[in-house]
Amino acid sequence: MKNKIKIRLKSFDHRSLDQATKEIVSAVKRTFANINGPIPLPKKIGRFTVNRSPHVHKKSREQFEIRTHKRLLVIDDPNPAVVDALSKVDLAAGVDVVIELESGE
């Protein structure tokens, strides 16, 4: 029975996201576990169009966008030292982390 830990990271700033992935990878490699990644996932671009003026000039509009960058890390056959190392990693405030435990047969 082989277990996997999948770590998905999301951030609006790609530099803080890359720094967080480096910290997680170095923490896992210190425990001599097998890690795959970081795998860059497709970024999501949200675009918003608003009127510049509240009442008139309908043709005058302004466009904004926000980009969500994502990375995936997969740890094969983790041991308790890996879980302990992951709990001690301190990440930036703008990085969202989702951890999934997958047990395979």
From Swiss-Prot:
The keyword Cell membrane does not apply. NCBIfam families: PRK00596.1, rpsJ_bact. Involved in the binding of tRNA to the ribosomes. Belongs to the universal ribosomal protein uS10 family. This is Small ribosomal subunit protein uS10. One of its GO terms (molecular function) is structural constituent of ribosome. GO terms for cellular component: ribonucleoprotein complex; ribosome. GO terms for biological process: translation. The lineage of its organism: Bacteria, Pseudomonadati, Pseudomonadota, Alphaproteobacteria, Rickettsiales. Part of the 30S ribosomal subunit. Keywords: Ribonucleoprotein, Ribosomal protein. It comes from Rickettsia peacockii (strain Rustic). Pfam families: Ribosomal_S10.
